[in-house]
Swiss-Prot record:
The keyword Nucleotide-binding applies. It comes from Homo sapiens (Human). It comes from the Eukaryota. It is found in: Mitochondrion inner membrane. InterPro entries: EF-4 (IPR006297), EFG_III/V (IPR035647), EFG_V-like (IPR000640), EFTu-like_2 (IPR004161), G_TR_CS (IPR031157), LepA_C_sf (IPR038363), LepA_CTD (IPR013842), LepA_IV (IPR035654). This is Translation factor GUF1, mitochondrial. Belongs to the TRAFAC class translation factor GTPase superfamily. Classic translation factor GTPase family. LepA subfamily.
Length: 669
C-alpha cells in the first residue's frame, strides 16, 4: 500500500522543472525514510513538512535569516483574515486542499460558532520561490476591539503585516486601529483588498480610501478573493519582496521573547517564542528574566499549524518551547528567556493587559463552587488577561470579581465556561474601574495610598471622605455612511461624549472621533450604534486615561434595607432615570408578600425613585354578617397593626431567579 503525499505550491518558475516528475510516494512502515519513484533525488532533501505517519524533526538551520519573513494578518472583524490564512496554508502545502478548510487556525468552539478569532494563532509556512526555500511565519490575529491586546502582542514578533480590507465595506474602525498599531511598531504594511468576487465590490473606491486615510499609494494594493483563491499567490510574492527579514544575530547569546502561551494539562505551559538572538535546543537550561527561575527545555518546534518538533530554533524564527513550567504566570507575556549563566539585556516587553470591565461571577448552586473554581483556574491559565478576585454576596453566596478587556471578552469567557467545562453561572451587571482621591487620613492609612481604584461598587467611598472621583475615558472612532451622521452625533452627546474630530473618508463615508466615558459604552452603545445606522457603522476605541466626574453611589433599598448586589455607581445626571428603571424591573421580578414592599433607589439619605409591591389582601370582614360598624372597624384596625408589625420584622427575601432576571435585563439594556 502506497500513500500519495501532496507537495507545496511554489511560484510558477519554481514549479516548472517539477511538472513532469512523478508524485512523491511514501512507503508505510515505522518511521522509514521516504522512497522515491522516478522523481529526482533532491526532492527527498526538499521535504520540509511531515505527514501523520512521519513526525521526523525538521532541520531549521536550512533557513538563513535572509529567507525568513515574519508577518501578521490584521483586519476589521469579518473582513476575511482567517479565510486568507486558510488559502495561504493550502498554497504552501501546509494543509491539504479540501472543502472543509474553514477557520483552520481558529481552534476554539466559540471561535467557530461565532465566526470570529479570539486567540492569535501561529503557523510556519514553507515556500519555494525562484529556487529558494523561504520560511514564512504567519500569525492570524483577532479583529474585534476587545482583543486588540492580542494584536499588539503578535505584532511584536513580526516585521510586516497584511492589512486586509473588505472590497464591499471598505475601511472600518478596527482597520484604522490596526494600521496605527502596525505603523507605531514601524512594520511594513501590505494592503490587501479582499472579497473582489462580491456583487457589490468596489475595489477602486477602497483603493482611494486607503490612499487618503493611510497615505499608501493605490498601486501597492493587492486585489484578491480569499474565498475563491483568486490572486492569492501574489500575496505570497509581496510578503517575500516587501517585508524585510528580521534583524537578528545567531552568534550572540540566546534572547527569546515570549509573546503568547497556552496550558496543556499533561505537558505544562507551551510558550510561543520569537527568537531575536542565538539558538535554543532540547536540553538547554534557560532562565526567565522576569522570575529568574531556571528551566530545562524538553521540546522545541514550530507550529505547522499543529506542533512539529525540531532539533533547534534559530534567531529570526517563531516557534514554541516546552520547559516544564507548571503555571502560565511563569511564562509571563513579554518576558525574555536566555541561557543559564549567559545573562542578556531583556527585550522591551508589552504593557500588561488592563481590564476595562468588571463583573461578579457566582455559581447557580453553591454546591458547584469547587467545580466552577477549578474551571475558572484552568481557563485563566490560557487567558492571562482575565483578573480574578474572590468575592461574596449575601444573596448569591461565594463567588469572584472578574476583570475583562471588554463586553465581548466577558461573553466569550462565559461561553467557554459553559462549553468546555459545562459550568452554569450568574454574571452581575458589568462595571468599570473608577478611582477616588481620598481626603480622609483614616482611609489613606487603611489603603496606604491617596488614590484608590474601585472595582466593586459596594466599596465606593463616601463623598465626605473624597476630594474627587475619576472615571475611565476612551477615544472612540466611528466610521459611518454620512446619512446617519446626525443620529450618531445625537447618540454620542446623550452618552456624555465630547467630539474631537470629523473627517470625510470619501463622498459617502465619515470618520468621527469622540472622547467617551467608558461606563457609557460598556453595556449597550455598540447595539444602539448598529440599530441607528442599519448595521453600517463600525466602532473601535482605545484607552485614554481618566477624567474628573460627578459620580454617586446609588443604593437599592427593600423596606429600608440595602441590597448589596444591586448597588451601582452612576453619573449624577443619570441617577434618577437609572434608579427608576432598576426599581421598575425589581417590582416585576419580586413575588408579593403578606405585607407591602417599598422598593427605593437612594443616594445617601435622599430617595430618588420608588416603586411599591402591593400586599396580598385577606378579607377579615368575611365572617361579619351585618352588625355594628365598630366591630368591622376594630377588625380592620387589628389587621393594619399586624401588617405594620410584620413589615418591621419580616425580611424581604429576594429569590435568586429574581436577581438573575434583574441582572440579565440590566446587562441587556
Amino acid at each position: 500500500m502506497w500513500t500519495l503525499v501532496g507537495r507545496g505550491w511554489g511560484c510558477a518558475r519554481a514549479l516548472a522543472p517539477r511538472a513532469t516528475g512523478a508524485a512523491l510516494l511514501v512507503a508505510p512502515g515505522p518511521r522509514s525514510a521516504p522512497t522515491l519513484g522516478a522523481a529526482p533525488e533532491s526532492w527527498a532533501t526538499d521535504r520540509l513538512y511531515s505527514s501523520a505517519e512521519f513526525k521526523e524533526k525538521l532541520d531549521m538551520s536550512r533557513f538563513p535569516v535572509e529567507n525568513i519573513r515574519n508577518f501578521s494578518i490584521v483586519a476589521h472583524v469579518d473582513h476575511g483574515k482567517s479565510t486568507l490564512a486558510d488559502r495561504l496554508l493550502e498554497l504552501t502545502g501546509t494543509i491539504d486542499k479540501t472543502k472543509n478548510n474553514k477557520q483552520v487556525l481558529d481552534k476554539l468552539q466559540v471561535e467557530r460558532e461565532r465566526g470570529i478569532t479570539v486567540k492569535a494563532q501561529t503557523a510556519s509556512l514553507f515556500y519555494n520561490c525562484e529556487g529558494k526555500q523561504y520560511l514564512l511565519n504567519l500569525i492570524d490575529t483577532p479583529g474585534h476591539v476587545d482583543f486588540s491586546y492580542e494584536v499588539s502582542r503578535s505584532l511584536s514578533a513580526c516585521q510586516g503585516v497584511l492589512l486586509v480590507v473588505d472590497a464591499n465595506e471598505g475601511i472600518q474602525a478596527q482597520t484604522v486601529a490596526n494600521f496605527f498599531l502596525a505603523f507605531e511598531a514601524q512594520l511594513s504594511v501590505i494592503p490587501v483588498i479582499n472579497k473582489i468576487d462580491l456583487k457589490n465590490a468596489d475595489p477602486e473606491r477602497v483603493e482611494n480610501q486607503i490612499e487618503k486615510v493611510f497615505d499608501i499609494p493605490s498601486d501597492e494594493c493587492i486585489k484578491i478573493s480569499a474565498k475563491l483563491g483568486t490572486n492569492v499567490e501574489s500575496v505570497l510574492q509581496a510578503i517575500i519582496e516587501r517585508i524585510p527579514p528580521p534583524k537578528v544575530h545567531r552568534k550572540n547569546p540566546l534572547r527569546a521573547l515570549v509573546f503568547d502561551s497556552t496550558f496543556d494539562q499533561y505537558r505544562g505551559v507551551i510558550a510561543n517564542v520569537a527568537l531575536f538572538d542565538g539558538v535554543v535546543s532540547k536540553g538547554d537550561k534557560i532562565v526567565s528574566a522576569h522570575t529568574q527561575k531556571t528551566y530545562e527545555v524538553n521540546e522545541v518546534g514550530v507550529l505547522n499549524p499543529n506542533e512539529q518538533p525540531t532539533h533547534k530554533l534559530y534567531a529570526g524564527q517563531v516557534g514554541y518551547l516546552i520547559a516544564g513550567m507548571k503555571d502560565v504566570t511563569e511564562a509571563q507575556i513579554g518576558d525574555t528567556l536566555c541561557l543559564h549563566k549567559q545573562p542578556v539585556e531583556p527585550l522591551p516587553g508589552f504593557k500588561s493587559a488592563k481590564p476595562m470591565v468588571f463583573a461578579g461571577m457566582y455559581p447557580l448552586d453553591q454546591s458547584e463552587y469547587n467545580n466552577l473554581k477549578s474551571a475558572i483556574e484552568k481557563l485563566t491559565l490560557n487567558d492571562s488577561s482575565v483578573t480574578v478576585h474572590r468575592d461574596s454576596s449575601l444573596a448569591l453566596g461565594a463567588g469572584w470579581r472578574l476583570g475583562f478587556l471588554g463586553l465581548l471578552h466577558m461573553e466569550v469567557f462565559n461561553q467557554r465556561l459553559e462549553q468546555e467545562y459545562n459550568a452554569s453561572v450568574i454574571l452581575t451587571t458589568p462595571t468599570v474601574p473608577y478611582k477616588a482621591v481620598l481626603s480622609s487620613s483614616k482611609l489613606i492609612k487603611e489603603h496606604r495610598e491617596k488614590e484608590i481604584t474601585i472595582i466593586n461598587p459596594a466599596q465606593f467611598p463616601d463623598k465626605s471622605k473624597v476630594t474627587e472621583y475619576l472615571e475611565p475615558v476612551v477615544l472612540g472612532t466611528i466610521i459611518t455612511p454620512d446619512e446617519y451622521t446626525g443620529k450618531i452625533m445625537m447618540l454620542c452627546e446623550a452618552r456624555r461624549a465630547v467630539q474631537k474630530n470629523m473627517i470625510f473618508i470619501d463622498q459617502n463615508r465619515v470618520m468621527l472621533k469622540y472622547l467617551f466615558p467608558l461606563n457609557e459604552i460598556v453595556v449597550d452603545f455598540y447595539d444602539s450604534l448598529k440599530s441607528l445606522s442599519s448595521g453600517y457603522a463600525s466602532f473601535d476605541y482605545e484607552d485614554a486615561g481618566y477624567q474628573t466626574a460627578e459620580l454617586v453611589k446609588m443604593d437599592i433599598l427593600l423596606n429600608g434595607n440595602t441590597v448589596e448586589e444591586l448597588v451601582t455607581v452612576v453619573h449624577k445626571d443619570k441617577a434618577h432615570s437609572i434608579g427608576k428603571a432598576i426599581c421598575e424591573r425589581l417590582k416585576d421580578s419580586l413575588p408579593r408578600q403578606l405585607f407591602e414592599i417599598a422598593i427605593q433607589a437612594a443616594i445617601g439619605s435622599k430617595i430618588i425613585a420608588r416603586e411599591t409591591v402591593k400586599a396580598y389582601r385577606k378579607n377579615v370582614l368575611a365572617k361579619c354578617y351585618g352588625g355594628d360598624i365598630t366591630r368591622k372597624m376594630k377588625l380592620l384596625k387589628r389587621q393594619a397593626e399586624g401588617k405594620k408589625k410584620l413589615r418591621k420584622i419580616g425580611n424581604v427575601e429576594v429569590p435568586k431567579d429574581a436577581f438573575i432576571k434583574v441582572l440579565k435585563t440590566q446587562s441587556s439594556k
